[in-house]
Amino acid sequence: MKRTWGGVLEDAETISYEHSACLLPEDVLMLKEPENGVSSKKLVTWNVNSIRSRMNVLLQWLEKHQPEVLCLQETKVEDQLFPSWELEQAGYKSYWYGQKTYNGVAILSRQPLTDIRKGFINQYDSENARLISGIWKGIRIINVYVPQGQNTESEKFPYKLEFLQQLHQEISSESYSDLPIIMVGDFNVALDPGDVNDPEAMFGHVSYHP
């Protein structure tokens, strides 16, 4: 895994990724091909915080790094306004689930995805575009934007906990049991000091309780 700590480092730091370890929004996960164990594919997750306002940066980044799959959070654009044409010109198929001003998730891929799912199967939180998935080369890629929760006293904190519980139920259901899963996104959760760039400043933050 390659990590730049949100752009703090000029050169990405290489970190060994272990099963269930926490991924930060701009981490680059390197997937080794099982046939020969030599070549690798890039799967990247990025909280873009408005895709239209970051479009020039996004296109430059795609041209430079050329990931196989890019998962975006906080696209903040309605479905009919998603910039799919520009991304197609850059060589990427786009799959998106959005809304005006807030939230929004998307998956960009060099190869077409199949069985695209938007939102929860049980229609939980259907007014918020926070979950999308699709099948890529026999793997279900799940892209999620978890609520931030503000603070433990906020009415939004129980919403975050419920969302995480619903997400666990979703991926544990029979409809997700047939294929390997890679779940990425912005979880608004940091599990240990290695998951934040300033542990002292972040201590006690709603997303960081070591």
Map each language-model feature to its residues.
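N-terminal, active-site-proximal structural segment of metallo-dependent hydrolase catalytic domains
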Residues: 1-105
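Short, glycine/charged-enriched secondary-structure capping and boundary segments
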Residues: 57-60, 84-87, 122, 156, ...
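Conserved CoA-thioester-binding segment of acyl-CoA-metabolizing enzymes
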Residues: 59, 156-168
